[in-house]
Design a protein with these regions (language model features):
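Active-site pocket-lining/capping segments in soluble small-molecule metabolic enzymes
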Residues: 1-127
Length: 127
């Protein structure tokens, strides 16, 4: 968080503070090759540990494989104190109701927390 505070002294800062982060982009549709084209509707890859990675399909059958865990920082006071100019909520697989719950949580009004979450690299820093 100190690195974000230092950076904001020189320019406005934005960070993704909620959502599934993309892990990989493929040139070929991974779902079409295995189960047939689903046009991006609910495709998921499952690894050997049972973790489920949502697959978002885009133009030209490119697929974006999302993290199995959702980045969540609403319950971290450091996120509010670090001085971000903008915080981006990245909705990908959420229902409209879940989007409302997330928004309320980030506006200090809820207690919703995702089932499987990650803090991303916010506590590791950049070397």
């Amino acid at each position: 968080w100190q690195q974000v505070r230092d950076l904001r002294k020189y320019l406005p800062c934005e960070a993704i503070i909620y959502g599934r982060l993309p892990l990989m982009v493929t040139e070929n549709c991974v779902t079409r090759c295995s189960v047939g084209c689903t046009h991006g509707a609910g495709s998921v890859l499952t690894d050997r540990t049972g973790a489920r990675f949502p697959v978002l399909c885009g133009y030209g059958c490119r697929c974006e494989i999302q993290n199995s865990k959702t980045l969540f920082l609403a319950d971290k006071p450091e996120m509010r104190r670090c001085g971000l100019t903008y915080g981006r909520l990245r909705f990908t697989t959420e229902t409209p109701e879940q989007c409302v719950q997330v928004l309320k949580r980030y506006q200090n009004g809820g207690n919703w927390t995702p089932e499987d979450l990650t803090r991303g690299l916010f506590y590791r820093g950049v070397e």
